[in-house]
Regions:
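Hydrophobic alpha-helical transmembrane segments of multi-pass inner-membrane transport and secretion
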Residues: 14-43, 304-340, 362-378
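Hydrophobic, regular-secondary-structure patches
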Residues: 37-111, 118-121, 135, 252, ...
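Short beta-strand boundary microenvironments
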Residues: 109-157, 255
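Mechanotransmission and gating elements of multispan inner-membrane complexes involved in transport
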Residues: 171, 180-307
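Glycine/proline-centered hinge or cleavage motifs at structural transition points of membrane proteins
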Residues: 340-342, 347, 353
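Short juxtamembrane loops and helix-capping segments at transmembrane helix boundaries
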Residues: 379-393
Length: 393
């Protein structure tokens, strides 16, 4: 049998292109369903663990899936916005603790998450380097952001404009990075956290500039009265918040009407949760209160229905590939009749021919198994990042 393996090995080594093609076909057919299973299992674990740890999520009426994906996984799809009035209403009810979220802007392709310090306690996030948020304009970044951008506490990060040509004249905000979070293996690793007021600064709702009442620049001040000062377009807003200008930052309009993308709602107990869900089921309400776990269950059900369809397609392709491989080996036997005749002449039997063919198939299957195993180990190692890239973000 060892002689048969040696002869088969020399044959497959000589016919490199044919052997490589057969190995590639077998490997692809084997690895596709296994990789899909690995990624879907990891995605289910990541999606459900985050969703089930979030009791309730408040947002504007519309797509519950968009709300959950933005509020929990910081997806780029921005849901309909709510206002700070929704947070105040929840606080006044005394039934839950609200945590506001404003996930709309980016900094070098990483989402800027405007929130409060309660969010870090809720998610169990701790600082590994530097300190926690303390002042307007400061940022704390996730471990993955720090690694990919090579940024540490003490560096700075600039917000990205929503469009290339920003006609609204909103300037990018330079944010000092005061802390780096300990790796949590969640979407929080890929986020830039700021105070919710800082997110409003990025949008231009809160801004700072020089004191017009003291300005003597005629090109900046158009008109001045005892009660009002009118500024021209030459008035430049600050693009960085420092100790010197932080007091000049102010709001325009009512803060209760300032936007949020979602509100995490942590009810006091099950009874409080039931009361709140009942209140927000009323049709005249402009807001919806969803259970993230239920929404993600629906998403996963759809994903696994698609997986079943893909499995059926892969199964059909596998059958077609097996038939094609059988045809290749059958034709190979016909083309190698002279070789087999030589084996017979030197005293070999039909069993020897069978051993040679079985050895060739075994070598091809073994090589395919090694490649498949190596690829699956790589997929398993990077499955968390792959799931975030393919399914979550």
């Amino acid at each position: 049998m060892i002689d048969s393996f040696y002869i088969a090995w020399r044959y497959v080594a000589f016919n490199k292109i044919r052997t490589a093609t057969l190995i590639a076909c077998v490997t692809l057919i084997a690895i596709l369903p296994l990789t899909l299973e690995l990624l879907l299992t990891e995605s289910e674990q990541q999606l459900l663990s985050r969703a089930e740890s979030t009791p309730l999520l408040l947002g504007a009426r519309g797509s519950a899936l968009d709300l959950v994906m933005n509020g929990l996984y910081f997806d780029d799809e921005i849901p309909e916005l709510v206002s700070m009035a929704a947070v105040n209403e929840l606080e006044d009810s005394g039934l839950a603790m609200p945590i506001p979220l404003y996930v709309r802007f980016n900094a070098r392709r990483f989402p800027i998450v405007g929130t409060t310090l309660d969010y870090f306690d809720f998610r169990g996030l701790t600082i590994e380097q530097g300190r926690q948020l303390a002042l307007l304009g400061e940022a704390v970044i996730g471990a993955e952001v720090a690694g990919r951008l090579d940024i540490a506490a003490g560096d700075s990060l600039v917000s990205s404009p929503e469009t290339v040509f920003d006609l609204a004249g909103i300037y990018p905000l330079k944010m000092p990075v005061v802390g780096v979070l300990k790796r949590s293996y969640t979407p929080d690793d890929l986020a830039v956290f700021v105070d919710v007021k800082t997110a409003w600064v990025v949008q231009g709702l809160v801004h700072g500039h020089e004191d017009l009442a003291r300005s003597e620049d005629a090109s900046v001040v158009i008109d001045r009265t005892d009660s009002n000062v009118v500024a021209s377009a030459r008035l430049v807003e600050y693009t960085e918040i420092t100790e010197e200008n932080v007091d000049s930052f102010h709001v325009h309009g009512e803060p209760d009407q300032y936007p949020l993308s979602a509100v995490i709602v942590i009810p006091n107990d099950d009874k409080s949760a039931a009361i709140l869900r009942g209140r927000y089921q009323e049709s005249e309400r402009l807001h919806q209160l969803v259970v993230p776990g239920t929404v993600i269950d629906g998403l996963l059900a759809n994903i696994f229905r698609i997986k079943n369809l893909l499995d059926a397609v892969i199964f059909i392709v596998a059958i077609a590939t097996a038939l094609a491989l059988t045809l290749v080996f059958t034709l190979s036997i016909r083309l190698r009749q002279r070789e087999f005749q030589t084996v017979f002449r030197i005293g070999g039997s039909r069993l020897t021919i069978v051993r040679l063919l079985v050895s060739e198939i075994a070598i091809i299957m073994a090589a395919s198994a090694v490649l498949c195993g190596t690829a699956l180990l790589a997929v398993d190692h990077y499955s968390s990042d792959l799931v975030r890239m393919l399914f979550i973000r």
